[in-house]
Design a protein with these regions (language model features):
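A short interface-forming secondary-structure element
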Residues: 242-244, 248-261
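Mid-to-C-terminal catalytic subdomains of enzymes
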Residues: 170, 174-220, 224-229, 238-243
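A short, flexible beta-alpha/helix-coil linker loop
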Residues: 101, 200-202, 253-256
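ATP-dependent adenylation/nucleotidyltransferase module used to activate substrates
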Residues: 2-181, 247, 261-277, 282, ...
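Short, low-order "capping/linker" segments at domain edges
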Residues: 290-301
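Conserved beta-strand segments that form the floor/walls of ligand-binding pockets within enzyme
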Residues: 42, 194, 250
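Small/polar glycine-rich anion-binding or flexible loop at a beta-alpha turn
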Residues: 231-246, 283-289
Length: 301
């Protein structure tokens, strides 16, 4: 079987199935969606959930409702992207407020923090589905997620949330290819996660930290860096002083030379200090998905 080679979010080559095999997976997805009869799609605005929302709308029309969660944990740019995609794709779309920050377990930032976030989200979505007569709640998990540490999947199982992209065997690269063919602007949208993922485990999640992270990442995006993270660290103070904050910048390896150019580096440092950080450092290893998991023994969920 012939495969086309493309690149993943990390720049690594990945195989995409032949057109015939990919069409078979797409047909399987549509069959799954048709069997739902009605569905609420958890729609973050990212590549996976955007494609699922588009496909569900194509199969079920107004019986597909796409819901975007809004809270301090999510960057405003994600909400704006979701609104734009919904408008362009003709989705039936609503935004709801979630309150994961009101949960002490979430704020404590354990290694399974994502479980509490998804538990909050799926509580809201399943209640909404029950109240408004939708048969299924679905998320955008794909086949590549199976071997990863994703505590949110435990919550999905508990609430019987379906993952039709995964069930159809679609990988991230295949979803990007199908999204490109569908004309979705999200086809090459870099993978992302909630802002809390930038805070080391067991360091409290607060609205103030999340705002600082969002503002600092916006500095990098305004300067043209598409794949980037600002990791928020607190440095222990000597004596009785307050801890200081450090922004550790992860930028895609191929973009590091530009970030280190004197003029750009000066702008990065100045503008991120203006956000409120006391220290700014660029991680020479570059961007790594889930870098705060490094060194931890986490089994796939």
């Amino acid at each position: 079987m012939r495969r086309r080679i493309t690149t993943s979010d990390s720049g690594e080559p990945v195989a995409v199935l032949s057109s015939e095999a990919l069409a078979a997976k797409e047909a399987r997805l549509r069959e799954l969606l048709a069997n739902y009869r009605s569905v609420i799609v958890a729609f973050s605005g990212g590549a996976d959930s955007a494609y699922l929302a588009w496909a569900a709308t194509g199969v079920l029309g107004q019986s597909a409702l796409c819901i975007t969660a809004d809270s301090p944990s999510y960057p405003d740019r994600h909400r704006q992207l979701a609104l734009t995609v919904a408008r362009e794709a003709g989705l039936r779309h609503e935004i709801i407020q979630t309150s994961e920050l009101e949960r002490a377990e979430y704020r404590a930032n354990p290694t399974n923090r994502c479980y509490y976030c998804k538990h909050e989200l799926y509580t809201s979505l399943t209640t909404l589905a029950s109240d408004r007569g939708f048969a299924v709640v679905a998320d955008g998990s794909n086949a590549d997620d199976r071997g990863d540490y994703r505590p949110g999947r435990q919550a999905a199982r508990e609430f019987r949330v379906r993952s039709p992209l995964d069930e159809a065997g679609l990988t991230k690269a295949e979803i990007r290819e199908l999204s490109r063919r569908a004309g979705l602007r999200t086809w090459d949208e870099p993978a992302s996660a909630c802002l809390s993922s930038r805070i080391p485990y067991h360091s409290e999640v607060t609205p103030e930290k999340l705002r600082s992270i969002e503002r600092a990442e916006e500095v990098l995006r305004t300067l043209g860096f598409r794949v980037c993270r600002v990791r928020h660290h607190e440095l222990t103070a000597s004596g009785n002083g307050s801890p200081s904050t450090l922004a550790r910048l992860e930028i895609a390896a191929e973009e590091l030379p530009r970030a280190l150019a004197p003029e750009i580096r000066s702008r990065i440092v100045g503008e991120i200090l203006a956000v409120g950080y006391q220290h700014v450092t660029i991680d020479l290893q570059g961007y790594r998905m889930g870098s705060l998991n490094e060194g931890l023994r986490l089994d796939p969920i």
